[in-house]
Curated annotation (Swiss-Prot):
<dbReference type="InterPro" id="IPR010914">
    <property type="entry name" value="RsgA_GTPase_dom"/>
</dbReference>
<feature type="binding site">
    <location>
        <begin position="161"/>
        <end position="164"/>
    </location>
    <ligand>
        <name>GTP</name>
    </ligand>
</feature>
<dbReference type="InterPro" id="IPR030378">
    <property type="entry name" value="G_CP_dom"/>
</dbReference>
<keyword id="KW-0963">Cytoplasm</keyword>
<comment type="subunit">
    <text>Monomer. Associates with 30S ribosomal subunit, binds 16S rRNA.</text>
</comment>
<feature type="binding site">
    <location>
        <begin position="213"/>
        <end position="221"/>
    </location>
    <ligand>
        <name>GTP</name>
    </ligand>
</feature>
<feature type="binding site">
    <location>
        <position position="299"/>
    </location>
    <ligand>
        <name>Zn(2+)</name>
    </ligand>
</feature>
<dbReference type="InterPro" id="IPR004881">
    <property type="entry name" value="Ribosome_biogen_GTPase_RsgA"/>
</dbReference>
<dbReference type="GO" id="GO:0046872">
    <property type="term" value="F:metal ion binding"/>
</dbReference>
<keyword id="KW-0862">Zinc</keyword>
<feature type="domain" description="CP-type G">
    <location>
        <begin position="116"/>
        <end position="271"/>
    </location>
</feature>
<comment type="similarity">
    <text>Belongs to the TRAFAC class YlqF/YawG GTPase family. RsgA subfamily.</text>
</comment>
<feature type="binding site">
    <location>
        <position position="294"/>
    </location>
    <ligand>
        <name>Zn(2+)</name>
    </ligand>
</feature>
<dbReference type="Pfam" id="PF03193">
    <property type="entry name" value="RsgA_GTPase"/>
</dbReference>
<feature type="binding site">
    <location>
        <position position="307"/>
    </location>
    <ligand>
        <name>Zn(2+)</name>
    </ligand>
</feature>
<keyword id="KW-0699">rRNA-binding</keyword>
<feature type="binding site">
    <location>
        <position position="301"/>
    </location>
    <ligand>
        <name>Zn(2+)</name>
    </ligand>
</feature>
Length: 369
């Protein structure tokens, strides 16, 4: 984590201190942590490397492992989590033993056949969805981002970067607003620092902002601009397809001079929705509003008589592409849900199979029938 605290590099020094020095700490977290005494520390995950976390504690950044008990119950800390550490001075180590209640949590559907959710970051106030002028500006992708951001509980803001490359930035902003409704859309150039002042209202002391977007849209350049120094590597866009190279490989927290927190994320290649039903409704609010006037409560807005949504499309109120995108994403959400259910059933079968094998081994060992 880039901050103004001391980073512990060796040895084991006492880092107990005032929890109010942890960015984002509040009374609710203090109450939740009050049950822990003695060798326990409060902290916030600033980066995660497989089984090791960097944790911001009062006055320092320390390394900590993840307890086996947490791993066994499937609780995995992510960047932005407030956690409880067991401080073990006799061994010179620290261990994350619990995760304090999350206010918000950004996730997406996990890749693979098992379904489920992949957690990205926690305790976010605002999420900057970063896109850029050129081939990355994809309205359908923005709809996906909005669905997962709304589901997280955080507030979305869309940043249109590299406006210095656009002939008519205002037209592009209007194009985005046609599908994002009331979501703020801010045109800027991270490289020339044009438009960065408009982000000030979202970067308040103690508040946390995450940046998400494809590789090459300028997230790392934005981080560097906010901090006033080069802390994140940047890379050129490939000229043949305008796609970016991954320069950020781990999620990482940065502390701004005013006390605001930024979380940078690697470029997301594939945005699977996961459990984003509520977010999908907010991302397509005009369709949900029109659907209240449909003749049938279970209307799918495909071919039913008396469908108010289809009528709104015919009247030019709702663009046909929006409805097509809504259908595509709701179908995907249904598929993801079924996939997750199948994955759980498969896991349950494997668990019973393992139990049966263990019982058989036990009976053989004890000689019992």
């Amino acid at each position: 984590m880039n901050n103004h605290s001391e980073t512990e590099s060796s040895g084991h020094n006492s880092v107990h201190g005032n929890n109010d020095n942890i960015p984002g700490w509040n009374e609710e977290l203090e109450l939740a942590f009050s049950a822990y005494k003695g060798l326990y520390l409060a902290g916030r995950i600033s980066s995660r490397h497989k089984t090791v976390c960097e944790v911001l504690v009062p006055g320092a950044v320390v390394q900590a492992g993840i307890s086996g008990a947490l791993q066994r119950i499937g609780k995995q800390p992510v960047v932005g989590d407030f956690v409880v550490l067991l401080d073990q001075p006799e061994t010179g180590s620290r261990m994350v033993v619990n995760i304090l209640p999350r206010r918000t949590c950004l996730s997406r559907g996990a890749a693979g056949d098992g379904g489920g959710e992949q957690l990205i970051a926690a305790n976010l106030d605002t999420i900057f969805i970063v896109t850029s002028v050129g081939k990355d500006l994809n309205l359908r992708r923005l709809e996906r981002y909005l669905a997962i951001v709304y589901s997280s509980g955080a507030s979305p803001v869309i940043l249109l970067n590299k406006i210095d490359l656009a002939d008519d930035p205002a037209r592009l902003v209007e194009k985005i607003r046609d599908v994002t409704g009331d979501v703020p859309v801010i045109p800027l150039s991270a490289l020339s620092k044009t438009g960065l002042d408009a982000l000030g209202p979202y970067l308040n002391p103690g508040e946390t902002v995450a940046l998400v977007g494809s590789s090459g849209v300028g997230k790392s350049t934005l981080i560097n601009a906010f901090l006033g120094e080069t802390v994140q590597k940047t890379a050129d866009i490939r000229k043949d397809d305008e796609k970016g190279r991954h320069t950020t490989t781990v999620r990482q927290m940065f502390l701004l001079p005013n006390g605001a927190v930024l979380i940078d994320n690697p470029g997301i290649r594939e945005i699977q929705l996961g459990d984003s039903a509520e977010g999908l409704e907010k991302a397509f609010s005009e369709i949900v509003d029109a659907a209240r006037n449909c003749k049938f409560k279970d209307c799918t807005h495909r071919n039913e008589p008396g469908c108010a949504v289809l009528q709104a499309v015919r009247d030019g109120i709702i663009p046909e592409e929006r409805l097509e995108s809504y259908h595509r994403l709701t179908d995907e959400l249904s598929f993801q849900s079924k996939k997750a259910e199948i994955g759980l059933k498969r896991l349950e079968k494997e668990r019973y199979r393992e139990m049966a094998v263990n019982i058989k081994k036990y009976r053989k060992f004890t000689g019992k029938p």
